[in-house]
Amino acid sequence: MTAMRRGGALLMALWTIAVLSVMVLSFAYEAHQQSGINVYVRERNRVNRFTEAGQAIAEVILLNYSSVADWTEDQDTEKLLEDDRWICEKQSLKMYANCTVGPLVLDEEHPESGTVTVEIQTANAGSQGIININQLYSGGGDGKYMERWWMLFKAYNIPEELSTPTDGTINLWNILIASWDDWRDEDDTVTAIDGDETGAEAAWYEEYEEQEKIDEEDRRRPRNGPIPDVHELAYLRGWRDYPQVLCGGVINPWEKPEDQITVKKPGIEHLFTTVGTKKIDINNCHSLDALVTVPGVYENPEDNDALDEALGVAQAILDALKVKPDYAVDETRDWWPFKDWNDLTERVEEDVGSDAGQYFAYKPDDSTVFKVKITGESMGMTHEVNAECYVKNGKVRYIRWRED
């Protein structure tokens, strides 16, 4: 019995040791996990503080960029920097409609702690989010808004007429334009183009949603005003039926491969924004597809070669920005903005029609909406903020603020 008891005691001791070992390992694992969580939280808080600092820097630049002196060839930049840390960025924003700060080390004693980068440009610029769609309708004061749609559709290979298995041959362009008009305008009259009611008001959507048994939370009615988000286009008549218009891809997959039509990716949605004016920041526009929609860049949109000719003019505009003009400029740059319409027409080798003048902006003004991108980085972690804002009465007012 004594031996059996000793054996049982030994087994119990071994079992207890095993349990304790598991508990110790568990505690160690939890401590390690907690340590990892603490590091994550600490670094996340750090990059959050970096983006907050970036916001402060952006606002300092935005609030008085317009009051600084223009860059001159003989300016004493070092002396100016002694008086204003951000003078170069302010001059850049004033003269070139964009500026970049950083990557900037905020803690000089611990440079490895991370950086912040601030990028500012006008809203109607860049390679996407250029055309304010809220201005591109019958009530937007643009007598050539339909022509601009036609050129946009041509640029993305969106067919004017489309043979469908359910509705026969439809005029897709008219449906897209008219349904957007009805969604955007303030009346309840169905828009007709060439005598056909190709638009859609509330009654059309009600009938469609009942027929398709659309869930209540997904039902929509015309906004009868400006839209806040370009993704809203996906709810419109025609646009919802042919999402390839927005995102690219084969628009008629029911056809034989040789008869299929591919809308150029990524589709037209990425060109749109919902803020700003009808003017494009010509000095910072990097999209040929946006430029070909400008009257004066294109001539007659109904010509078969209208798109090719417009692309040639648009490319000539972008090329001219990279050629140093024959007046005093900052030669450290690799591109030089157009000062105004006269400067543009003198520097661009192709003929640009006079109509284009009313669609181009050259510098920010009181009506300008800005895009601000703030990126904080620390220990491999990144926090990005994308905002849209404007300056009014001495304050930066935010229209949209998105964080990753």
Predicted features and spans:
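Compositionally biased linear targeting/interaction segments
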Residues: 2, 8-18, 22-404
